[in-house]
Each structure stands twice: as C-alpha cells, then as structure tokens.
Design a protein with these regions (language model features):
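GST-like domain detector, emphasizing the conserved glutathione-binding G-site
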Residues: 1-151, 174
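Active-site-flanking alpha-helical
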Residues: 98, 188-189, 226
Length: 231
C-alpha cells in the first residue's frame, strides 16, 4: 500500500485507496480536462471534490499541493522511479498522464510536439480568453458599464475560434488523431453555452467547431468525465 502521508492534502481529503491516483478537482473546464484524461486512459483514480471557496482552495492542505490555489491537482503514488509525485496545472497533468501511459500524444515525435503545441495554445489563449469572456458576460464583470473589456474578450474569442475552425478543416481531431490537445480544448468550448455567449462569438457561423465539440462529448469517456467529481 502506497504511503501518501508526506502530502498534507490527504489530511483534509483522505485517500480511500492510496494505491491509485488521487484527483482533487471540480468539473469546471480545467477540472474536466483531468477527469476526462483519466477516463480516456483507463487509469485507476479517486476523485475528491474541492470547492472553489477559500475554505477549500486556500486551505493549508490544498496549498501544500498547489500553491496557486486552483483545481485540478493530482497525486500519483506510482510516479517517476516508482515514487509518489504531486502535480498541479491542468496542462502539465495532461502531458504527464499521456507520457505515463504512452498514449494520446500521437504516433510520432512530430505528433507529440503538435499535440503539446495545441495544449499550450489552449492554456495560453483559449482558456484565459474564454474565462474572461465569461466574467464580463455572465458574472460580476457584466455589471461594468464600460463596454471595452467585454468587446475585447468577445473579439478575441471570435479570433481564437476562427483559428481553431480553420485548423480543423478536413480532420476530426486537431492533430489528426485524438489526443490530449482535444481534451484540453473541448471543455473550454463547452463553457461557452454555460456563459450564454454562443451567439456573441458567432458559434453558428463556424464550419467545423460545433461538430468537433459534439464528436468529443459523444466519446463515452468524455461523457463520464464531464461531471467528476459531481458538482
């Protein structure tokens, strides 16, 4: 039995089975990336619900694993050289899980870098921009009278969606075959409906992206992972 006592987070969220991957998350777009990857890869894991309130993500126990106080985070009891490893940042988790299993990074070294390229695109562009769009359209930012922030993020969302739409021409998945890049991208696309922003970003004018998103959530693992741990 693995010993996870060196990880203080396990005091607040005890592991029932310390021999499997411990996931600390919530089914937000970033949280879904981790749970869907685990489901797609068929890895044994245990999901712990971490609320976004300060009592959870800013607790000493959670900060001991992720000092950036964001979900998701994981502990893998069977990390490099057989030693436990804790990780945060959803993109890093995706790359780690793919490399651990030798899956979802394409067939060739070039595929691997193309997949990582699109993960970085999501991490640096699509996720942050759509998150800000949601803030200024649905949440507290919607109360700001100055229209410029809202317009900026709507326009940037449109630009990024056009980049994706063009890049999907003639292919089902962003690097040609299903990969962690698709797992990184699609949960954020799905968030546009929650933000009530589909019309604002011209969703109906996109040629390839809507079918791409539908194809993604038609995968059984994606459907399972989209609500783990349950809200």
């Amino acid at each position: 039995m693995a010993d996870l006592s060196a990880f203080p987070i396990t005091r607040k969220w005890p592991a029932k089975d310390p021999s499997v991957i411990q996931l600390y998350s919530l089914p937000t777009p970033n949280g879904q990336k981790a749970s869907i990857a685990l489901e797609e890869l068929g890895l044994a894991y245990e999901a712990h619900r971490v609320g976004l309130d300060d009592a959870n993500v800013k607790s000493p126990e959670f900060l001991s694993l992720n000092p950036n106080n964001k979900i998701p985070a994981i502990i893998d009891p069977d990390g490099p050289d057989g030693q436990p490893i804790g990780l945060f940042e959803s993109g890093a988790i995706l790359i780690y899980l793919a490399e651990k299993t030798g899956r979802l990074l394409g067939e060739t070294p070039a595929d691997r870098y193309h997949a990582i390229q699109w993960v970085m695109w999501q991490m640096g562009g699509l996720g942050p921009m759509l998150g800000q769009l949601g803030f200024f359209v649905k949440f507290a930012g919607a109360e700001i009278e100055d229209p410029r922030p809202r317009e900026r993020y709507i326009n940037e969302a449109k630009r990024l969606l056009k980049v994706l739409d063009t890049s999907l021409e003639g292919r089902d998945w962003i690097i040609g075959e299903f990969s962690i890049a698709d797992i990184a991208i699609c949960p954020w696309l799905n968030g546009l409906a929650f933000y009530e922003a589909l019309d604002l970003v011209g969703w109906g004018d996109l040629k390839n992206v809507p079918a791409y998103l539908e194809r993604f959530y038609n995968r059984p693992a994606a459907e399972r992972g989209r609500n783990i741990p349950p809200m």
